[in-house]
Structures are given as structure tokens and as C-alpha cells.
């Protein structure tokens, strides 16, 4: 093995307390294990959370039977719930959260939980609002590090 590279033993499960990263998946809400149970000697990562579904007519892989972990009727509902999820990450930082990855950047096949549509033509939430939410979260993480 190359000792200059971090090892993620298993993304999402089957943890054997080896490797450098403990990568947990939780849907839809971001959660971390109780401190002291997992990850005492590992980097804690929320490798997947979110999965908020909003199909956009004319921009899906298929017309029916699309899904997300939680479904919404319009962009405003989606943005309100997404904002809540991002805000829920802040209290996890003092518990050791080092990274969080939203599922997912774009819709894929039957999953409509992307920030943008399958064809990449429509952002489901205003980019400026996403930038603002993410910057606020980043700034809170920097404050916790000091």
C-alpha cells in the first residue's frame, strides 16, 4: 500500500475498524454514531445523506416510477428541506464530522434526488442559495476548528 494515501475501508457499512476513514451513510437526515462507539481513531465522514426527490417533467430518465428517499411537490418545499438538512450538519462538527456528501449532484436513471435534473439542464434550487448555505456551513466548520 501507498502510505501517503488515506484508506476508506468500506463506504456505508461493514466496518472492521481498519483504514483511516469511517464512512457512514444515513438517509435522509445527517446523523453520526454516538461518540466513542465508532471512529475514535478514524476520520468521521457522512459519505451519503439527503436523497431528496423532485421529478421535473420533461427532464427525467423515465416519466413514471421515479423516486427519492423523501419526495417533494415543488422547488420551494425541496429548498426548505435541503436547508434544514444542511443546518443539521453544524452540531455534528463538534462530534468529529470531517466531511459530508449530499446524494446526489444530478438525477440518475430512476432516482430524482439530484441538485440538477438527469439531463443537467435545470438546477432544482437557486445556485446562489446553495452557495450561501454551503459557505455558512463551511464558515461554522472553520470556527469549530480554532
Model-derived segments and spans:
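Substrate-binding/catalytic cleft of secreted carbohydrate-active enzymes
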Residues: 1-122, 132, 143
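Surface beta-strand/loop "capping" patches
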Residues: 135-146
Amino acid at each position: 500500500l501507498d502510505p501517503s494515501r488515506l484508506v476508506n475501508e468500506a463506504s456505508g457499512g461493514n466496518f472492521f475498524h481498519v483504514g483511516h476513514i469511517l464512512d457512514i451513510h444515513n438517509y435522509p437526515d445527517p446523523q453520526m454514531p454516538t461518540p466513542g462507539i465508532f471512529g475514535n481513531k478514524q476520520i468521521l465522514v457522512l459519505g451519503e445523506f439527503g436523497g431528496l426527490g423532485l421529478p421535473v417533467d420533461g427532464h427525467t430518465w423515465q416519466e413514471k416510477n421515479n423516486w427519492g428517499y423523501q419526495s417533494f411537490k415543488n422547488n420551494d418545499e425541496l429548498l426548505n428541506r435541503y436547508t434544514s438538512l444542511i443546518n443539521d450538519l453544524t452540531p455534528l462538527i463538534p462530534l468529529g464530522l470531517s466531511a459530508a456528501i449530499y446524494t446526489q449532484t444530478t438525477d440518475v436513471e430512476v432516482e430524482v434526488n439530484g441538485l440538477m435534473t438527469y439531463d443537467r439542464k435545470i438546477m432544482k434550487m437557486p445556485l446562489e442559495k446553495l452557495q450561501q448555505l454551503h459557505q455558512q456551513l463551511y464558515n461554522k466548520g472553520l470556527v469549530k476548528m480554532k
